[in-house]
């Protein structure tokens, strides 16, 4: 029984493989963008390289989907809603995010200390990062001396802060809750767009309110998926195959959103305008593939493994590329101008290969040396 079976494998309503697929695609897109920034090596998919930074938007939507899915399933099955005591929820989220993050932050701090020496600015930067508030202060956000990609953790932390309130509200009153979140993003985005062209806009367009609608899309996608995943139609091949085809169509839509973003004349301005279409395309892809034909078990296992690595990979890839290029001058170069800016295509190719290899190697070391052992200790998990 598998992807070509006339009697499809039952839908996994609790952990759809489509969520792992989207997580891997989003993490790859972000890394493709950051490594391309350093190497300038073209993969032939220029729009994904140029617009890959908005993979963050996909990760935000996906986080809302995955966290809310147990609530959506309980609502659909008529079961009691999951317990969500804030203290327990915050403890679980901290155990999931902080060990790998603090290990990465230590490395980032040591690199910054070597580059700049100890000073008050670095101390304040470190304090903001330790408390996950780095995005709230310009010096520790766009002016950080530490790992620049971790601003997203402020967005996630603020979402986790309100999730124990949002989850029961959305389960009991989905339309008003989703609508209110979308209105928050729409109102904030309109205000922020009026700041475009000023120095303030760069600080505004990725703040938490600018993602509230994206979070709403993720929670709505969980409700739709849960509603459809338990129907009698799921045992029939034709509708499941049709869902897979719709998932492919949604990916084409997502790819078009990426193309529009990549070639936008005003990239950051359009990023805020394009955020909801992008989130909707990704959510459609997530739901349709989740309801579609089940992937073979070996493929699902590989996707699950890659998805498990994605957090450490996200934390390490960009700072490693910058460290190798500017601190170690690898691949070897001299002078004040990096070879990619001089059109050295051989160096670009070598840099691209080196930065990806280093990111994957350090990700494996961080995951198996830090993230997984600590998770086993904190959660009592095996294997």
Question: Can you describe what each PLM-predicted range is?
Answer:
Residues 20, 24-27, 56-57, 63, ...:
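Residues within membrane-spanning alpha-helices of integral membrane proteins
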Residues 21-27, 63, 93, 99-102, ...:
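Conserved beta-strand->loop/alpha-helix structural units within folded catalytic cores of enzymes
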Residues 25-34, 174-194, 243-252:
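Small-polar-interrupted transmembrane alpha-helices in polytopic inner-membrane proteins
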Residues 26-29, 33-36, 62-65, 128, ...:
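Membrane-embedded alpha-helical transmembrane segments of multi-pass integral membrane proteins
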Residues 28, 102, 106-110, 114, ...:
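Generic alpha-helical transmembrane segments of integral inner-membrane proteins
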Residues 70, 83-91, 97-155, 186-202, ...:
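Membrane-interface helix-loop-helix regions
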């Amino acid at each position: 029984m598998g992807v070509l079976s006339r009697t499809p494998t039952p839908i996994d309503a609790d952990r759809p493989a489509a969520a792992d697929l989207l997580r891997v695609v989003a993490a790859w897109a972000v890394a493709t963008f950051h490594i391309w920034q350093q190497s300038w090596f073209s993969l032939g998919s220029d729009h994904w390289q140029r617009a890959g930074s908005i993979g963050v938007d996909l990760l935000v939507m996906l986080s809302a989907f995955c966290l809310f899915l147990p609530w959506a399933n309980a609502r659909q099955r008529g079961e009691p809603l999951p317990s969500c005591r804030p203290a327990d929820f915050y403890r679980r989220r901290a155990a999931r995010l902080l060990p790998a993050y603090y290990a990465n932050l230590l490395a980032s701090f040591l690199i910054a200390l070597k580059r700049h020496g100890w000073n008050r600015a670095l101390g304040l930067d470190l304090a903001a990062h330790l408390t996950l508030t780095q995005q709230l202060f310009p010096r520790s956000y766009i002016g950080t001396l530490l790992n620049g990609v971790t601003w997203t953790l402020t967005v996630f932390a603020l979402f986790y802060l309100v999730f124990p309130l949002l989850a029961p509200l959305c389960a009991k009153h989905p339309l008003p809750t989703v609508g209110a979140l979308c209105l928050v993003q729409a109102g904030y985005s309109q205000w922020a767009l009026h700041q475009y062209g000023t120095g303030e806009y760069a600080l505004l367009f990725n703040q938490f309110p600018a993602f509230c609608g994206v979070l709403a899309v993720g929670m709505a996608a969980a409700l739709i998926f849960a509603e459809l995943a338990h129907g009698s139609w799921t045992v029939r091949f034709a509708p499941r195959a049709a869902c897979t085809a719709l998932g492919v169509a949604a990916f084409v839509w997502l790819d078009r959103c990426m193309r529009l973003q990549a070639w936008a004349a005003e990239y950051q301005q359009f990023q805020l305008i394009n955020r909801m279409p992008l989130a909707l395309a990704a959510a459609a892809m997530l739901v349709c593939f989740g309801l579609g034909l089940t992937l073979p078990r070996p493929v699902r296992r590989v996707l699950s493994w890659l998805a498990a690595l994605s957090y450490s990979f996200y934390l390490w890839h960009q700072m490693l590329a910058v460290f190798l290029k500017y601190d170690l001058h690898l691949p070897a170069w001299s002078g004040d101008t990096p070879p990619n800016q001089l059109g050295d295509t051989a160096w670009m190719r070598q840099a691209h290969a080196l930065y990806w290899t280093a990111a994957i190697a350090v990700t494996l070391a961080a995951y198996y040396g830090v993230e997984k052992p600590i998770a086993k200790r904190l959660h009592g998990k095996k294997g």
